C-alpha cells in the first residue's frame, strides 16, 4: 500500500436485516489518498449514504455491517475503526473524521445561537480549553468559512441556507480532522450559493490538507471538484478513475448513461431514456432494491 493512503476500505458489506434482507453495500473496497477529494457518485438509493455511515459507524438497526474493515492511516499508527469501542468511537468522530450530513443546514438547534453550537464541539472534545480560547476559535472558524465572527450570536433562523451550511462546515473543520465526509452538502442550495460552497471547500482543502469523500448523485458537480471519482450502483463500486478519465473515457455503460443523463447547453438533444436506470433487469443480483 502506498504511503499517501489515508483511508482504506476493504470488502465492506452492509445488510438491512429485514424480510427479505437488502444488500445495501456489497463488498466495497476503496482507498482515499492524503489531500485528495474522492467523489462518490450514483443515483439515489445506490448505497452512497449507507457506505458513509458505515465508515463512521453511524448505522442504526436494521442496518448491519456483515463484512469488511475500515482503517485510517495516521502518522502515529493505523486506526482500525471496526475495533474501536463506544467511547473511542465518540472521540474519533469530529476529531479524526468529521461529517457534513445530508440536509445539514437544517440540523442546527433553532433555539441556540451558532456560537454556542460551535463551542459545544470544543467543550466535548477539548475540555481543557478555556472559554476565551473556545470563543476565539469559534470566531476564527466563522471568519474562515465566510460567515464572519460578528455573527457568532446569531440564531439559525437569522442566517440564509448557504450561511447555515457554512456553519456546518465550520463545525466539521473545528478539530482539524484529516478526513471529512460530505454527504450532498449543496442540496437545496441555489446554483450561485452552490458554486460558492464548492469553491470554499476546495480552498479549505488546500489550506488545511484534509481529505474529502464527496457524495452526490450530481456527476457534473463531482467532475469539477474531485481528483478521482468512484461510481456506485446497486451497492457496488463499478468503476473508479480520475475525474478526467471518467468524463472522457468512461468504461462502464452505466457511467456513460449517467453522464448522458445531464443536459448540455450546446449540441443536439439526446434520445429519451425510458425506465429507471437503478430498477432495470441488469443489476448484479437481479434485483434493484432501494438503498439509502
Model-inferred region functions:
Residues 174-178:
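A short, proline-enriched helix->beta-strand linker immediately N-terminal to the Walker B motif
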Amino acid at each position: 500500500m502506498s504511503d499517501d493512503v489515508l483511508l482504506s476500505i476493504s470488502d465492506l458489506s452492509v445488510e438491512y436485516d429485514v424480510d427479505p434482507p437488502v444488500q445495501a453495500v456489497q463488498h466495497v473496497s476503496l482507498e482515499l489518498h492524503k489531500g485528495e477529494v474522492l467523489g462518490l457518485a450514483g443515483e439515489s438509493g445506490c448505497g452512497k449514504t449507507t457506505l458513509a455511515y458505515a465508515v463512521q459507524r453511524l448505522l442504526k438497526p436494521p442496518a448491519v455491517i456483515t463484512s469488511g474493515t475500515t482503517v485510517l492511516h495516521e502518522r502515529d499508527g493505523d486506526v482500525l475503526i471496526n475495533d474501536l469501542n463506544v467511547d473511542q468511537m465518540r472521540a474519533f468522530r469530529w476529531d479524526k473524521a468529521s461529517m457534513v450530513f445530508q440536509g445539514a443546514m437544517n440540523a442546527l438547534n433553532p433555539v441556540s445561537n451558532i456560537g454556542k453550537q460551535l463551542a459545544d464541539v470544543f467543550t466535548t472534545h477539548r475540555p481543557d480549553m478555556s472559554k476565551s480560547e473556545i470563543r476565539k476559535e469559534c470566531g476564527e472558524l466563522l471568519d474562515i468559512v465566510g460567515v464572519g465572527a460578528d455573527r457568532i450570536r446569531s440564531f439559525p433562523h437569522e442566517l440564509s441556507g448557504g450561511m447555515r451550511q457554512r456553519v456546518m462546515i465550520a463545525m466539521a473543520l473545528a478539530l482539524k480532522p484529516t478526513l471529512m465526509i460530505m454527504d450532498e452538502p449543496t442540496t437545496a442550495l441555489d446554483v450561485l450559493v452552490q458554486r460558492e460552497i464548492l469553491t470554499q471547500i476546495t480552498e479549505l482543502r488546500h489550506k488545511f490538507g484534509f481529505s474529502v469523500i464527496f457524495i452526490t448523485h450530481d456527476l457534473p458537480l463531482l467532475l469539477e471538484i474531485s481528483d478521482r471519482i468512484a461510481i456506485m450502483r446497486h451497492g457496488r463500486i463499478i468503476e473508479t478513475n480520475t475525474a478526467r478519465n471518467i468524463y472522457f473515457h468512461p468504461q462502464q455503460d452505466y457511467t456513460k448513461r449517467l453522464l448522458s443523463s445531464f443536459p448540455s447547453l450546446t449540441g443536439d438533444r439526446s434520445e429519451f431514456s425510458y425506465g429507471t436506470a437503478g430498477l432495470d433487469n441488469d443489476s448484479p443480483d437481479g434485483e434493484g432494491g432501494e438503498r439509502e
